[in-house]
Structures are given as structure tokens and as C-alpha cells.
A protein has these predicted regions:
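Conserved active-site-adjacent core of cysteine acyl-enzyme catalytic domains
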Residues: 4, 44, 54-161
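Active-site nucleophile-adjacent alpha helix/oxyanion-hole segment immediately C-terminal to the catalytic cysteine
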Residues: 2-64
Length: 161
């Protein structure tokens, strides 16, 4: 696997797109999931300069919890790191991943309670391509959910290289 984010297509009995699992990074503040995701992403994609949560929070964060306002900060993050973003309902995620995951990890901020939570998607698998694997900075774990679960937790913001 190269450091530029090239995905590996699974063949044989496996179906889907698998990227190198990113390092597990735990968020350091209540709302700094976005910064932990970008730090993790920068460690596996040489197209993004190495980042730390602390620097990202200092530069882009808002307030003591380290959160951001997506409507203003997502475009700023995209500009700073050469990313592209989209906002859509959850049902579009599967198609988006099929189109872009082979070329880039995908930052995904979905609705969790009354706030948004960011994760870094690195795999789309299963016979129907409905299993989404991601690095979750809430505890710093690798987890998975179905595309249906993401659909139920939309709308969402996604970013890719």
C-alpha cells in the first residue's frame, strides 16, 4: 500500500474496497473528534501534511471543548488541506464510497444525538457492499456499521482528498 492513499480492491470471496486501517487516535477533548480524524488520516496519506490534534484545535477549534462549526470550518479545512466535501443524506453514502474510497480515505461526520461526530472510513465490504469500517476517535477504536445505520444517522458531511 502506498502512502498516497491508493486503495486495495478485494477479490475472490471478499467484495469491496479496503484501505490500510488508519492508526487509532482518541480525541483529547469532548468535541475534538474532527481533529483526531484528521491527525489519523495525516499519518496514512502522504498527500496531507502530518497533523496533531493540538495544532488543529488551536488553529480551527472553537471553545474549550475543541469543537467546530461545520458550516464555516469544513470549507476552511478543505482549503487548508486540499480536500473536497459534500453534504448529503445518509442513503447516498454507499454510492459515494464506491466512487471515492479506492482513491481516498473518507472523513464522515454524521448525526449523533443533537451533535455531529466524525470518523475516518477506510473499508466498504460485504456481499452487498453494506459494511462500513472506520476509525472512531471516541475511544480510538476500529468499528463498523452498516450503510443503513449511517442512513439513519444522516444528514452527514464527508470529505475526501
Amino acid at each position: 500500500m502506498s502512502g498516497n492513499g491508493t486503495g486495495t480492491l478485494l477479490h475472490g470471496n471478499g467484495h469491496g474496497i479496503l484501505r490500510q486501517p488508519p492508526p487509532r487516535i482518541s480525541q483529547t477533548l469532548t468535541d475534538s473528534c474532527w481533529a483526531a480524524v484528521l491527525e489519523s488520516w495525516s499519518k496514512v496519506d502522504s498527500r496531507i501534511a502530518a497533523q496533531t490534534q493540538a495544532t488543529l484545535i488551536q488553529t480551527f477549534g472553537e471553545g474549550a471543548t475543541g469543537g467546530i462549526t461545520p458550516t464555516t470550518k469544513i470549507p476552511a479545512l478543505c482549503s487548508a488541506f486540499g480536500l473536497q466535501y459534500r453534504v448529503f443524506v445518509g442513503s447516498e453514502l454507499q454510492h459515494y464510497l464506491q466512487e471515492h474510497l479506492a482513491h481516498s480515505y473518507v472523513f464522515c461526520a454524521y448525526r449523533r444525538d443533537t451533535f455531529a461526530h466524525a470518523v475516518l472510513i477506510y473499508r466498504l465490504s460485504g456481499r452487498s457492499l453494506t459494511h462500513v469500517s472506520y476509525m472512531d476517535p471516541d475511544g480510538g477504536y476500529h468499528r463498523w456499521h452498516s450503510t443503513e445505520w449511517f442512513s439513519a444517522n444522516g444528514p452527514m458531511v464527508v470529505m475526501r482528498k
